[in-house]
Design a protein with these regions (language model features):
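Acidic (Asp/Glu)-rich catalytic clusters
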Residues: 20, 81-92, 125-128, 179-181, ...
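Short, acidic/polar
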Residues: 43-57, 111-127, 171-176
């Protein structure tokens, strides 16, 4: 649920959110998917820079890092641990399981309980954790009964290996069904200023006090173009289109927790600066009209 507390650092200006009444984070987090090679596969082009990015994120006040075993695979989790372990107090690390990676840009759902339990064990080992703060089902595998997949996470939670459970790329019905099996604290769906297909999911998260984590929050490249509404707003605010897009997300709902990712310290610093960018009602209205027209 959103709170009125104050996190430290520039990222703290984004406001706060609490998962499950006990995990307090700054709303602007960091997504670690880009700390890998092309196709979200293998090592990053510059591992030293990737390590610098993660460390700089924490210096800027970010205390919520989202990763997954599928990123690399395994590479992203390993870089997070190498950069930050032993972890600073208050850092919340979220990861995900439920995919297999046969190659670059290839993703295959695997929700078999034995796979999910093995995936969680691997993440614990790579991240050097005794317990994962937020473990998310990366996708609901249509080949496996959802209750079996969620039951595996419930078992892991009962064993003390994960603290809280989240979902990814789900609709409202799937969230409700999951909540009948195990407590859910977050949903991670694709969402941005230019992609709002999951408005109903966002509204449900607001009603339930669930964190809504938009992946692809900058809609990679869709914000470009000097004639676009976002670029026009950015020029008025003396900001970048990406900063406007992130500031819009933060203003859109107190349960939205953006996790922009990058492998560049420069881009990271630009993204975090969005926490201090004020979006007025006129700009919110203009961006809303842009969405309705698209």
């Amino acid at each position: 649920m959103p709170t009125k507390g104050h996190s430290k650092g520039l990222a703290g200006k984004s406001g706060e959110f609490v998962f499950g009444n006990d995990l307090r984070i700054a709303r602007l987090g960091f997504g670690a998917m880009r700390l890998t090679g092309k196709g979200i596969w293998g090592e990053p082009a510059d591992r030293a820079e990737a390590l610098r990015v993660v460390r700089r994120a924490v210096e800027l006040g970010i205390n919520f890092i989202d990763t997954a075993d599928a990123y690399g695979p395994n590479v992203s989790e390993e870089i997070v641990a190498e950069a930050l372990h032993p972890y600073p107090a208050g850092l919340v690390i979220a990861t995900k399981g439920g995919f297999e990676r046969p190659g670059p840009d290839r993703w295959v759902e695997n929700g078999r309980p034995e796979h999910l339990k093995s995936a969680c064990e691997g993440s614990l080992r790579r991240l050097k954790l005794d317990r994962i703060d937020l473990y998310q089902l990366h996708r609901i595998d249509p080949k496996v009964p959802a209750e079996d997949q969620l039951g595996a996470l419930k078992d892991l939670q009962a064993q003390g290996k994960i603290k809280h459970i989240g979902l990814s790329e789900v609709n409202v019905r799937q969230i409700r069904d999951a909540q009948s099996i195990v407590p859910i604290v977050s949903v991670q769906n694709r969402y941005s200023v230019s992609d709002r297909a999951y408005e109903d999911v966002l509204e449900y998260c607001e009603q339930q006090g669930l964190g809504f984590i938009p992946w692809f929050p900058l809609a990679a490249g869709q914000l470009a173009g000097t004639r676009s509404t976002v670029s026009s707003m950015a020029a008025q605010l003396k900001a970048t289109p990406s900063q406007v897009a992130l500031a819009w997300l933060l203003a859109r709902s107190p349960v939205i927790l953006p996790i922009p990712g990058t492998a560049s310290v420069k881009h990271l610093e630009e993204n975090v600066a969005s926490a201090d960018l004020a979006i007025n009602e006129d700009i919110m209205q203009a961006l809303g009209e842009m969405a309705r027209a698209s």
